[in-house]
């Protein structure tokens, strides 16, 4: 099997910036079609990038892009994005569940509207976008669903920390495991991907902190590309860590993803324990 995304159609939630945009641009360099469903129609006062600027970058990178302004929580918006992808490019080969919300407050301090937001975007959005694309994935040659969610680390120090966020992210990973089983007979792969270290994104800079000890989003893009170009029938039901994927691909020098001149210890991401 030739490992390329040339001519493949990727339907992604979010993607205006950060990891999602990096994944989109890696696909675009192969000549993929990238359809982005995102709310960012106009610039954010503090964050760079909109769904329109992201599509412009996709096209400059060599792909074809389509922006769909909408909310992954809204069933009509999701249907619109699916239909737009099929109308523009003839089908859907890949779904990337990238959109996410984060609030690391304790259970006592977490406002229920923030809890609901995380559940609706993270867990429900993953289920909804995947569900809506299934009929079209069945018709694809090497169909994949890739969800940006963590391994199910049941250590109490993770389950009991920022519980509201943990529930929403683990729900995404359970969706991966369930879809992989449900769709195995159709040859549709479902996998999750999570970074070992913090990634230098707006969420890390603004919520988590520690961007100076973080890898670039490109490591997630390269790992996602590796997963999405594998045989869907043989690569499914995995909760991958980014650098493990790359090591399996024969990549041994991961320093290119670290900050220039950085020689210290990188900060581990949430849900990842020291080796």
Predicted regions and their residues:
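Active-site loop of short-chain dehydrogenase/reductase
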Residues: 8, 63-64, 91-92, 137-151, ...
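Catalytic loop of short-chain dehydrogenase/reductase
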Residues: 138-139, 143-185, 196-199, 205
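A short, exposed helix-loop element centered on a Lys and neighboring polar residues
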Residues: 130-131, 177
